[in-house]
Curated annotation (Swiss-Prot):
The keyword Protein transport does not apply. Its main location: membrane. This is Ion-translocating oxidoreductase complex subunit A. Its EC number is 7.-.-.-. Coiled coil: none annotated. It is found in: Cell inner membrane. InterPro entries: Ion_transpt_RnfA/RsxA, NqrDE/RnfAE, NqrDE/RnfAE_oxidrdctase. GO terms for biological process: electron transport chain. The complex is composed of six subunits: RnfA, RnfB, RnfC, RnfD, RnfE and RnfG. Part of a membrane-bound complex that couples electron transfer with translocation of ions across the membrane. It is a multi-pass membrane protein. GO terms for cellular component: plasma membrane. It comes from Serratia proteamaculans (strain 568). The gene is rnfA. It holds the Pfam family Rnf-Nqr.
Amino acid sequence: MTEYLLLFVGTVLVNNFVLVKFLGLCPFLGVSKKLESAIGMGMATTFVMTLASVSAWVINTFILVPLDLVYLRTLSFILVIAVVVQFTEMVVRKTSPALYRLLGIFLPLITTNCAVLGVALLNVNLGYNFLQSAVYGFSAAAGFSLVMVLFAAIRERLAVADVPAPFRGSSIALITAGLMSLAFMGFTGLVKF
């Protein structure tokens, strides 16, 4: 149990996908203008990353490795992610039409989110078992969501703040992201891998 807790804390805080590995920057900067859309995107991405991580482990372990087709790993993972995203889109459309309209084009763009493919490939490269893959996928998504929600909250406050003209828009957003990355560096000694 301690191993899974360390994996969770290490992935969310120490090895955050956005601030440390620089994966998923497009939705991080694109969807984080409003807190509501960041929360919705975070929930959808959490669902997709967890399911894609587990699905990729199953496909790699039971199909690609036994049949010696590991060279098709990236292509097969992209297909798995596309199927999971389509499933997520159908679920969100049925359960929350308002969230579906709010996310708009960003929901299908989860397919091209490099963080989703990154978590699937890292699971395989790190040699995780099924449960570790599920925890790692969920942890990576939780870290992604945490950072995106925090960033959206900060950007909403910056929208009404008196920011100097040269720093308005994407300039202050990138400065804020850099400061968040520095803040998360403080967690570096928390977990040793």
